[in-house]
Amino acid sequence: MLSSLSPYMANPRQTFTQVLNFALVLSTAFMLWKGLSVYTNSASPIVVVLSGSMEPAFQRGDLLFLWNRSPRVDVGEIVVYNVRGKDIPIVHRVMRTFPDVPGKDKTKKGGKQDVEASPSSLESQKLLTKGDNNLSDDTELYARGQDYLDRKEDIVGSVRGYIPAVGYVTIMLSEHPWLKSVLLGFMGLMVILQRE
């Protein structure tokens, strides 16, 4: 087995070049992802639909493109949110919006006298969501004690476009962990066997 690797060990410069090329591909992909994250103002600018709760609008495996630069979300808009304490993105439609203007919290304590809260602190928005294919709203999905989603804290982004079925590869990799090993092994083998 080691004798089959001897041509690669005989020329360390070529081996080093292949390793650098592989590192370049990985770092370029990472930079593109981070650049897209900054441009869209979303930690996850691209997500995959994991369930059928949004059918017929989106099918399981659809790849969604998100935008999170709008200060407000409108009723009927499709958003992606994360439940607090869980790391699974949920894609659902906004059914109702509520301005977050607390009744008794309009002033903040500031020493001896009360100080009016700034307008930016009152501009938060509460949202109630529901999957198109679900019978009830998402209050059962939210974190314990949470009745609404907070626009600034919970929303990953609003859906601006999609490509059907492309994301099904990631679902297959999640459901069958052995496929990840096969894919990584294949990629590693291609890097080793590639000659320039």
UniProtKB/Swiss-Prot annotation:
Subcellular location: Endoplasmic reticulum membrane
Biased composition (Polar residues): 118-133
Residue numbers on the Cytoplasmic membrane side: 1-14
GO function terms (MF aspect): serine-type endopeptidase activity
Region (Disordered): 101-133
Coiled coil: none
SUPFAM superfamilies: LexA/Signal peptidase
Catalysed reactions, as listed in the record: Cleavage of hydrophobic, N-terminal signal or leader sequences from secreted and periplasmic proteins
Bilayer-spanning residue ranges: 15-33
Gene Ontology cellular component list: signal peptidase complex
Main subcellular location: endoplasmic reticulum
Region annotated C-terminal short (CTS) helix, chain positions: 182-193
Glycosylation, residue list: 134
Taxonomy, superkingdom: Eukaryota
Lumenal face of the membrane: 34-196
Keyword terms, alphabetized: Endoplasmic reticulum, Glycoprotein, Hydrolase, Membrane, Protease, Signal-anchor, Transmembrane, Transmembrane helix
Membrane topology label: Single-pass type II membrane protein
UniProt EC number: 3.4.21.89
Note on domains (UniProt): The C-terminal short (CTS) helix is essential for catalytic activity. It may be accommodated as a transmembrane helix in the thinned membrane environment of the complex, similarly to the signal peptide in the complex substrates.
Family of the protein in this entry: Belongs to the peptidase S26B family.
Its job: Catalytic component of the signal peptidase complex (SPC) which catalyzes the cleavage of N-terminal signal sequences from nascent proteins as they are translocated into the lumen of the endoplasmic reticulum. Specifically cleaves N-terminal signal peptides that contain a hydrophobic alpha-helix (h-region) shorter than 18-20 amino acids.
Self-association state and partner proteins as the record states: Component of the signal peptidase complex (SPC) composed of a catalytic subunit SEC11 and three accessory subunits SPC1, SPC2 and SPC3. The complex induces a local thinning of the ER membrane which is used to measure the length of the signal peptide (SP) h-region of protein substrates. This ensures the selectivity of the complex towards h-regions shorter than 18-20 amino acids. SPC associates with the translocon complex.
Protein name per its UniProtKB record: Signal peptidase complex catalytic subunit SEC11
Species in which this protein is naturally found: Blastomyces gilchristii (strain SLH14081) (Blastomyces dermatitidis)
